[in-house]
Each structure stands twice: as structure tokens, then as C-alpha cells.
Regions:
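Short beta-strand-loop-alpha-helix junction that forms the active-site gateway
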Residues: 43-57, 83-87
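Conserved catalytic cores of phosphodiester-cleaving nucleases, focusing on short active-site segments
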Residues: 29-33, 38-47
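Domain-level recognition of nuclease-like catalytic cores that cleave nucleotide substrates
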Residues: 72-119
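Short, charged, amphipathic alpha-helix that recurs within catalytic cores of restriction-modification
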Residues: 53-72
Length: 119
């Protein structure tokens, strides 16, 4: 569920998001690599027509920082990753894709390479 990050990782470790974030951010998926002490926030964006997702893509840096407030309490880092379908290969996304990388976030098309999450 979208609440798994909280139910299975943060709450059992005594982290109450309300003390650090004004919003309970709900990632599509979260993978925690205990060996590298990194939380991977994974957002899936699969479009087949124009929509409101376009503006949301540039929020990755802000959201990564929001998650980092929680993970850093446990000495964990955070990586923010988008998984896109081919819709986002259109030229009109060139600038936002460049921005995503420029601010230290990542994106992949269709699937995430295991090496990206430390496996």
C-alpha cells in the first residue's frame, strides 16, 4: 500500500512524520536498502494523453528533501526515482527531464535497473 513506508519502516523506528513534514507524502513505491542505508522513493508516471502530471515532474527535488527529513533521522540517504513510459520521450519533456537529473533525481523508462537501487 502507499502507506507501507510508514507502517513497516518509519513508525517501527519511532519516526512520526507529523513532527517533520506538514504532509504525509505517499510514494507509489519505496525500496529501502539496509546495506547502503538508502531509501529509494519510486514514482510511476504512465501517460497516454496530456495531463496535469507535466507540472508535477519538477517537484522531485522538493519531495526528495521532504523524505530526507525523515530518513536522515536514521542516517539514511534518499534517492528519488521516476519510472516513465515512452510518452515522456517526446521532445516537449526534454527540459524537465534535464532538470530532474540536474537536481540529483533520476528517471528510467519502463523499469528500474537493479544496479540503480544498490542490488
Amino acid at each position: 500500500s502507499k502507506h507501507s513506508l510508514y507502517e513497516y519502516f518509519l513508525i517501527p523506528k519511532g519516526i512520526d512524520y507529523k513532527k517533520y513534514n506538514s504532509v504525509k507524502w505517499l510514494p507509489d513505491e519505496c525500496f529501502v536498502n539496509y546495506k547502503t542505508k538508502t531509501g529509494y522513493i519510486i514514482e510511476k508516471k504512465f501517460q497516454n494523453s496530456p495531463g496535469s502530471v507535466d507540472e508535477k515532474l519538477a517537484a522531485c527535488d522538493f519531495k526528495r528533501r521532504e523524505y530526507l527529513k525523515l530518513f536522515s533521522l536514521l542516517d539514511y540517504d534518499v534517492e528519488y526515482i521516476y519510472v516513465f513510459n515512452d510518452w515522456f520521450k517526446q521532445p516537449k519533456y526534454k527540459d524537465v527531464l534535464a532538470y530532474i537529473r540536474a537536481v540529483g533525481c533520476y528517471y528510467y523508462f519502463d523499469e528500474i535497473p537493479l544496479s540503480c537501487i544498490g542490488l
